[in-house]
């Protein structure tokens, strides 16, 4: 054929059925191709039925008639019909140009004429818009929502003609259809010329929106294309001069000319609609012919509807706006062959639903709207073939067919690009426009169509191993029925997707490509067959390089394509080809096996949730992986089998067997999932166990066993150490879980017959326990079993299933013979009660035939024969019972000489007659069964004793250096659920067994190499089993209780976490103890041996020497009191110690009152620097000669205090130092263990000294005395702090408390604990409602905390709005309480206002201490803190126990600074000069005065909340902000401004916080003045400027009004109104380019709204006065200074407006008056709103300005003045008209 070399077009069949001049594939109104092809052969019209594959009907026109065009025109009954445009120069039918409608009679090959109509001009194209079937019923016509005059027609067709004529027509029915004479009706009233509105005389005026136009002679323009946009009912008319007319057939009755972008012929127009477009756009593609300078081109046009406007559904599609989205020139394209939409059905179920307005209509030919998918179009064109170097360049050029598919959905996914671009790969594909190459010659090709009537006509390439973008290109689509209509034949072809094309090429040329894969690998990746980011070519993204494997990445990419896409035959041929070396074959086998094993683990990863009971069904991705794995395993198995035969390698044969095991496992797993065997049903599993137990007991009674029991025993002998046994004895293993059952299929040591019998029996038991129907016949069981296992799975068939059922029946059936023998045996003797003895046998009570079985008789005969023959043959030793029976057998056969002396002596007769035979052999007496049983029991007793001794030892041991030695596992965390040797949370039970394998097996398990598998090894089966087994991390059984506890509930409180490998005894002891054991004490009086191991000394548990703790990783040892110690232990303490310590507390308080230290916080030391008065501490140090005692002795941790979390880096150094100190002390004396335990919580009643119960050391008592001192001091401080305040005590439950260690030798620890205690002291004070100045400090707190994170819109607005309402509703009592000076014992803690104290906690529950607060929690607490205090009393506030984060701590420090300053200013007369202010954020050795630069830096970074109240300032201002309006701020605003500037500090790398002691009020005032001066000198930042602008009294709506005034919209002015009887009516004269319009009385004047044209509609009649009243009146010529705005909807519905309210032709003067009036109104509204804003600003702050908007908004007056200046400048500028659309 002519397309044999084509790679995309695949020819199926050709039909040489005719010779013709033109072929047309019929399409319905929306472009769906139908299975009919029309052929024009001179004056004969033929119809080829594709389904019948022959010409079925024809019609012969009169001689000399020329057939122009044809279209689909069904009858009212839905029968096939066509519409034909005919030219008859002889006028044999009475007309030269006419249109006929032909209908098909199923019983006759001839067609009949049903309708006809004469046309005035020569026909060029015909198009059926709405057929008789579409409009047969009145209800159907109503659904179409057409113009009311068109609704009366039986059908609507469009006829394009020469001389610029396009008609909407209704054909006239023929009275006698069967008449041989053609009757052509001439009814001009049924013809409506759409182009008359734009034709004046013999000139076509193509006018655009901007009023520019071009004139063309009508004789040179004709209609070249017709198409219907179904959603908006718009007819698109393509003109030969490049223009396009859009005529709306809906009730809007409007026409418009689209933008003229070229002057070339519009060949075809194809409507498109994207899938589920929310914007309701409608698209169409217009194909443009070539010119001498340009190739052919496509244009993508978009029609926009009024979806964003509030209009009715019927008006939504009125007057759409069209624009070009994409233009693309097809290089070397010569002419268009076919442009056909690809229309498919979205869902067949949607065809039955009732269609509404969106669907337009419902009939046999059209499915508008949601049922049809019209997102693609086929573009077929002729292209000049490229000349190859070997061809003759002077030869005639050859033209071939080339096609492209445009997908608008893919264009959407690429974010509607404006040009066609490639993806940058080797194939150079476009994401939404795919080119199809072919070698089909284009000389006689007339049309190409794609049928999509059946579901299999269109398919997309799918891949289970790749999700590349190329798989969603149009090139990934395959079309099965593509018909190419030629002049001489019809070819049925297939368009194949590019992926299949590349796969076929790789398969055919695989032997050559495997040696040179560089080029093809890049093509494979460019087609998306594998992912680009996988260099190794594996789709699992986990395939590592195999050791000593020489395969390149390009070869792996090629092999992946062959293996994963199922090219089995081509891949297996490589094993038998002689041109491929054996080395390469082995490497390919190793690679294939590696891919199979790796993909098996991928499948296990996706099924693990189902096996573990965490999900009930597989995901779609997992289902695809299972299906792909089954195919992959078959390909690999076939290659390994072929390669083993070619290379004669047994190892490869064994590996092939392992691959088939993986395939059986995967396939059976899929079947179990499909039949709901997986996931496990616990109830059904229990039923299976009960059924098996019942059957086993029945078989035991029958002295037999079940067949499945023998199968399990054989499995145990073949694979005793397999992981599927799950440490269960084999006789109790059945029925297993599905996981264990399927796992045995992966074991290559077990034969296939055993696997088959086991699986079949399991499936039978599962079916038998069905809750729906438990009674099944044997046939039903067999059929259901074969249905689940599928035929040939493990070579199973119905015959083998029946055999297994029969064997099970026999085991459960009891025979009469066996019952009799059993009864006789029980009568003679019972093995359970007595044993066999010589006395019973000599008594003749038991005959030998009953006592000795047949098998034993045969064995005894052989033994007797061997014994009688004599010689050196050594007889085997029998067990005692068999020996007795054998002696009886010899006695019965009278072989007395062979009997033993024991048997002879037991028989009186024999001992009398044969006394010499008693001691003839020197063998001693053998042990009886009783003796052996006693010996075994004694051994077991001793073994149990040793085991019990081992169990008394500690459960968790420290790690040992020898890793190969295995220690006894710990039972603390369950049997096999977890292990102490793994860092992960869960280690499967088989992990330890896996670790026992050698390095070769470990390398296989770790995906590192499989060379060890193919190497010679005696344990090959074990290694293969290890390789293909389910990974241990997925081998976890289903546990419902564990799943509920882990997945839906909180973890158990007494469940300790798993412990990793321990490297010290201390960690072992901490991790191993349970949560309910309480405090552990060890006696030190028992010494530990030097060489004793931990196992030997483990049971003592009394002597642990902690001096051996030298590990650097030891945790910090801290003090913790036990809750279990009650008050009865506390009362035993002596009162003398309590009194002494109270005196020490008072002395220490007096010393601390004289000296104030600066202490560390948990922040970095460089973050904060606090000014303090150091004269008093220095004097105290000088007098005493020593430093001030640490503050930790004075302050103690309270149970209701909030403890901040410590920094990890800081604590790591602290732990190391503490450990070092304890080690040094341990050399001299024993100390307490210091283990801090999370389950021991200290209560309030535990605050006194607690004696040690089990240890009497003096050292430990000393350490507890220190604790008692701390407790007493804490109680003293708490009582002193609460005495001056007359508030109620907080009633709370005792809260847990963690006692911090007391190590006075370490300075860092001093600061750590003192900082904690200071924080607690400040939080102990009762809440004080802030005054105005303190309110400002709270604002500063909010600002500082808020600035720690990027501000969001919510925090910026809410924080400012809420801060203004915190001073409202103040109680006078609270104000008086604020002015009360704090007492001495409070130590100025009442000044600080913590955000955590202001929060209320209704429940008083203890939150988690270890979880730091999130950012949202911190921000929300800061924003709401000020407003929550408003209506609450101090005694109602309850402290919250969540520890503050780092941001909260820094914010509290900042708030303390601001609060201290405000108190200093307001309480100067009442404050004592000796008061000291405690610092919370400065280290002991850091005291610095901030310079001016630091102050400037601090004030520069002000927060948004602060910058809002700061307006533009003058250098003389005293710090108060003044808005632009001149309004004086209120006192609260002024105070807020000044205090905010004084206290506004932010956190940076080295931020400085000023803290002034009480005697330095003058210094503080000077400092505040310096800050104000520094702030005035620096330039205003963006936030400051925006805040000052925001305070102006400008209504925000005024700027919007002004912008609306400036914005004008043009009215589309090229829609025409046409009279229904408009044959002789002339068109209005339109002014030429650049000239004003002539004022003619006969022609309507063009208004400024239309910009040079009159509004045009399809219909205009004198009878329709209401329709004409909707069009605007005669207006003046257009001026570009229009400012009024009229929408299309206002023009269309203008009849609803009263005549006296209409404004005719508003001139420039009137427009100015209107604008002035509007501006006055807007100014008045602005003033009224501004005045209300002024009143409101006294109560609340202005909204925070948004980031980046620093420019002040203009007022309405300024906007109006600017608009006037712009209009004057525009009026002075001349109007430039162009054929192209004006750029707005």
UniProtKB/Swiss-Prot annotation:
<keyword id="KW-0995">Kinetochore</keyword>
<feature type="region of interest" description="Important for nuclear localization">
    <location>
        <begin position="1601"/>
        <end position="1784"/>
    </location>
</feature>
<feature type="region of interest" description="Chromatin binding">
    <location>
        <begin position="1239"/>
        <end position="1601"/>
    </location>
</feature>
<dbReference type="GO" id="GO:0051301">
    <property type="term" value="P:cell division"/>
</dbReference>
<feature type="compositionally biased region" description="Basic and acidic residues">
    <location>
        <begin position="1337"/>
        <end position="1351"/>
    </location>
</feature>
<comment type="function">
    <text>Nuclear envelope protein which has essential roles in assembly of nuclear pore complexes and in chromatin maintenance during the cell cycle. Appears to be a stable structural component of the nuclear envelope during interphase. In dividing cells, localizes to kinetochores during early stages of mitosis and then to chromatin during late mitosis. Important for several mitotic processes including chromosome condensation, kinetochore assembly, chromosome segregation and cell-cycle timing.</text>
</comment>
<feature type="DNA-binding region" description="A.T hook 2">
    <location>
        <begin position="1746"/>
        <end position="1758"/>
    </location>
</feature>
<feature type="region of interest" description="Disordered">
    <location>
        <begin position="1115"/>
        <end position="1784"/>
    </location>
</feature>
<keyword id="KW-0469">Meiosis</keyword>
<dbReference type="GO" id="GO:0005637">
    <property type="term" value="C:nuclear inner membrane"/>
</dbReference>
<dbReference type="GO" id="GO:0051292">
    <property type="term" value="P:nuclear pore complex assembly"/>
</dbReference>
<dbReference type="GO" id="GO:0003677">
    <property type="term" value="F:DNA binding"/>
</dbReference>
<feature type="region of interest" description="Required for nuclear envelope and kinetochore localization">
    <location>
        <begin position="1"/>
        <end position="956"/>
    </location>
</feature>
<keyword id="KW-0653">Protein transport</keyword>
<feature type="compositionally biased region" description="Acidic residues">
    <location>
        <begin position="1266"/>
        <end position="1278"/>
    </location>
</feature>
<keyword id="KW-0498">Mitosis</keyword>
<feature type="compositionally biased region" description="Basic and acidic residues">
    <location>
        <begin position="1279"/>
        <end position="1293"/>
    </location>
</feature>
<protein>
    <recommendedName>
        <fullName>Protein mel-28</fullName>
    </recommendedName>
</protein>
<feature type="compositionally biased region" description="Polar residues">
    <location>
        <begin position="1581"/>
        <end position="1606"/>
    </location>
</feature>
<keyword id="KW-0811">Translocation</keyword>
<keyword id="KW-0137">Centromere</keyword>
<feature type="compositionally biased region" description="Basic and acidic residues">
    <location>
        <begin position="1367"/>
        <end position="1382"/>
    </location>
</feature>
<keyword id="KW-0509">mRNA transport</keyword>
<feature type="compositionally biased region" description="Acidic residues">
    <location>
        <begin position="1566"/>
        <end position="1576"/>
    </location>
</feature>
<keyword id="KW-0238">DNA-binding</keyword>
<feature type="region of interest" description="Required for chromosome segregation, nuclear growth, nucleoplasmic accumulation and cell cycle timing, but not required for nuclear envelope and kinetochore localization">
    <location>
        <begin position="1630"/>
        <end position="1784"/>
    </location>
</feature>
<feature type="compositionally biased region" description="Polar residues">
    <location>
        <begin position="1445"/>
        <end position="1459"/>
    </location>
</feature>
<feature type="compositionally biased region" description="Low complexity">
    <location>
        <begin position="1297"/>
        <end position="1306"/>
    </location>
</feature>
<feature type="region of interest" description="Required for association with mitotic chromosomes">
    <location>
        <begin position="566"/>
        <end position="778"/>
    </location>
</feature>
<dbReference type="GO" id="GO:0005654">
    <property type="term" value="C:nucleoplasm"/>
</dbReference>
<feature type="compositionally biased region" description="Acidic residues">
    <location>
        <begin position="1321"/>
        <end position="1336"/>
    </location>
</feature>
<feature type="DNA-binding region" description="A.T hook 1">
    <location>
        <begin position="1630"/>
        <end position="1642"/>
    </location>
</feature>
<feature type="region of interest" description="Important for nuclear localization">
    <location>
        <begin position="846"/>
        <end position="1071"/>
    </location>
</feature>
<feature type="compositionally biased region" description="Basic and acidic residues">
    <location>
        <begin position="1126"/>
        <end position="1149"/>
    </location>
</feature>
<dbReference type="GO" id="GO:0000776">
    <property type="term" value="C:kinetochore"/>
</dbReference>
<keyword id="KW-0158">Chromosome</keyword>
<dbReference type="GO" id="GO:0005635">
    <property type="term" value="C:nuclear envelope"/>
</dbReference>
<feature type="compositionally biased region" description="Polar residues">
    <location>
        <begin position="1716"/>
        <end position="1735"/>
    </location>
</feature>
<dbReference type="GO" id="GO:0015031">
    <property type="term" value="P:protein transport"/>
</dbReference>
<dbReference type="GO" id="GO:0060090">
    <property type="term" value="F:molecular adaptor activity"/>
</dbReference>
<keyword id="KW-0813">Transport</keyword>
<feature type="compositionally biased region" description="Acidic residues">
    <location>
        <begin position="1222"/>
        <end position="1232"/>
    </location>
</feature>
